[in-house]
Amino acid sequence: MLNRSLLVDGVNEIFVVTTRISLVTFLLTIYCAKEFFSEINKEYFLKGTLTGFLAITIPGWTFIYALKSISSGLQSIFISTIPMFTVFWVFLVYKEEKITRLKVISVFIGLSGLILLFASGATGLSNDGDLVTGGLLALIGVQGLALSNITNKKDSQYIPARTYLLAQWIASTVFSLILFYILGGEVEILNRSQALRLSGLVFIDIFNYSLFFYTIKRLSATFTTLVDYVVPIVGIYVGYIFLDEVINNIFFVTLFFIFISLYLAVKDEARSLD
């Protein structure tokens, strides 16, 4: 919602995403620098670079461009599919985590909801928007996050936490600055309200990423992402209240399928933990 409110105010998306990622990196450097410089090596940095590209660069850039075509509420629905796609990618590339028949069924149920959503063409915007463009961009970002859940899970077992965390953000800052230059980004002067919202995004990023990084070391990649199912309910109504976004009935139909998918995934995960 904060991202889209800045776009609505006319702040350039290239500036928003580059500044947000750069500020997070600056603050994390203050906190992690000592451990980072004492522990970093080529292997750790390369692994951090890959995960940072998947977890930060890809979703950071695709999500903000998606918001030019779909509502923040609709984007939150796409974000809620991260656990579903995590199951998919775990099945393909991460053999250490068991994927049961019930989890596979949950993925197909969630995909059915997405198919219905795309068939509707609803964007959540009063000026129509473009579901194909916005939806595909959002899904690309989701794939990056789903894959990063797997690399985070594998690498965080032996790479020191602060070293791994800062390597990801440093790499993402470099990628973003390169994109800023290539895409012709320009530095903008923000008013007080815009600066506060951008600062809010920065601190939300730090909190969310730190919490995720703590849980991924202790729980499975699939279970860690289940919190993403809470996002759409809040996102839809916050966008409706503060940004005058449109709530379409198909959103709730899609969420129904996604929540069934959630129930099956949680049931299976709880069984495996027992």
Segments predicted by a language model, with ranges:
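Transmembrane alpha-helical segments that form core, pore/gating elements
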Residues: 1, 28, 86-92, 124-183, ...
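Hydrophobic/aromatic residues within transmembrane alpha-helices
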Residues: 6, 16, 66, 78, ...
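Juxtamembrane helix-entry segments on the extracytoplasmic side of multipass membrane proteins
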Residues: 9-18, 40-45, 119-144, 181-199, ...
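Helix-helix packing/entry segments at the starts of transmembrane helices
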Residues: 18-19, 56, 60, 75-81, ...
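Hydrophobic transmembrane alpha-helices of multi-pass small-molecule transport proteins
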Residues: 28, 89, 101-121, 176, ...
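Specific transmembrane alpha-helical segments of multi-pass solute transporters/efflux pumps
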Residues: 29-75, 79, 115-116, 201-219
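Cytoplasmic-side transmembrane-helix entry/capping segments in multi-pass membrane proteins
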Residues: 43-51, 99-111, 159-167
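Residue-level signature of transmembrane alpha-helical cores of multipass secondary-active transporters
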Residues: 48-52, 64, 76, 107, ...
